[in-house]
Amino acid sequence: SSDHCGPLQRLKVKQQWAKAYGVGHERVELGIALWKSMFAQDNDARDLFKRVHGEDVHSPAFEAHMARVFNGLDRVISSLTDEPVLNAQLEHLRQQHIKLGITGHMFNLMRTGLAYVLPAQLGRCFDKEAWAACWDEVIYPGIKHD
């Protein structure tokens, strides 16, 4: 593990995620904002989500998809301070993304999207450096496969 995404940064990311992730309807709103931001960066990315009705981010199928993705992200972020659990979560997600053909490009869209929507939820307490470090050094390398 790296100094940049060290124990303090991991704790900050965990706490900030817990606050932003919130409960119920807030999660749906956060999800919609995130995917809108991703599709605004690259409208062709929508095509990857045909199976879950990506053309309508308010559809029940897409809401269920967002909940699954957030669930996975929540498990990864929650285990940032527990290396063996973290590595198992990342490997599980890596395998899933290989099966779905999700590329590094999509992870970059999500990284940029999170950096856009999380400050809207968290205001000044959003720690951009900690999030960037933990995404770039831990989360992304653990999931990417291309």
UniProtKB/Swiss-Prot annotation:
This is Extracellular globin-2A. Residues 4-146 form the Globin domain. Keywords: Disulfide bond, Heme, Iron, Metal-binding, Oxygen transport, Transport. The keyword Metal-binding applies. Belongs to the globin family. Disulfide bonded trimer of chains IIA, IIB, and IIC. Giant hemoglobins of worms are formed of a monomeric subunit and a disulfide-bonded trimer. Disulfide bonds join 5-134. One of its GO terms (cellular component) is extracellular region. InterPro entries: Erythrocruorin, Globin, Globin-like_sf, Globin/Proto, Haemoglobin_extracell, Mb-like_M. CDD domains: Mb-like (cd01040). It comes from Tylorrhynchus heterochetus. GO terms for molecular function: heme binding; iron ion binding; oxygen binding; oxygen carrier activity. Heme b binds at residue 97.
